[in-house]
């Protein structure tokens, strides 16, 4: 897809299927298969709507790579661009376009994930220990900062398991 988000209006594979050497052309409408490691939410090929730039909408099997490339160039796709969600904070706003409108219906790894249907929150975990307000009131210093990781990060900071104790002499 050349769009960050769009409705798929039409896919015409007629010319690609007619090309000599093409064995099969498949679109998302013909392949109702979802995949996902923790939340089974991604179609192998987009169905009805694309949710990110470059999302595949068709696949070609052919006698050679050259024929497959020619066939993909013959596939006609008509899109209706939709407003994309471009920032994670924007995605959390009320009324933001839903990346996954059927979030509550997906199969997911229940021991670890708690999706919030009707939002863009695929997992919400609430951890509370002790009285935070009391802890802040008793603290000599309270430092507030916002920390972020890149959107694709295989080693997140895991702040929910970090404990730090500051000792005299600037030691942690």
Describe the residue ranges of each PLM region.
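Structural alpha/beta core scaffold segments of enzyme domains
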Residues: 1-172
């Amino acid at each position: 897809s050349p769009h960050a988000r769009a409705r798929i209006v039409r896919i015409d594979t007629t010319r690609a299927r007619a090309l000599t050497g093409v064995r099969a052309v498949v679109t998302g409408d013909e392949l109702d298969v979802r995949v996902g490691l923790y939340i089974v939410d991604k179609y192998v090929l987009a169905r009805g709507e694309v949710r990110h730039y470059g999302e595949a909408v068709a696949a070609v099997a052919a006698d050679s790579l050259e024929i497959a490339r020619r066939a993909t160039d013959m596939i006609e796709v008509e899109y209706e661009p939709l407003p994309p969600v471009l920032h994670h904070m924007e995605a959390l706003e009320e009324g933001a376009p839903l990346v996954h409108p059927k979030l509550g219906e997906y199969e997911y790894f229940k021991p670890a994930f708690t999706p919030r249907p009707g939002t863009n929150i695929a997992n919400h975990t609430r951890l509370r220990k002790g009285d935070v307000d009391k802890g802040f009131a008793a603290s000599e210093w309270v430092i507030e900062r916002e920390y972020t990781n890149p959107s694709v990060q295989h080693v997140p900071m895991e702040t929910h398991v970090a404990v730090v104790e500051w000792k005299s002499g600037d030691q942690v």
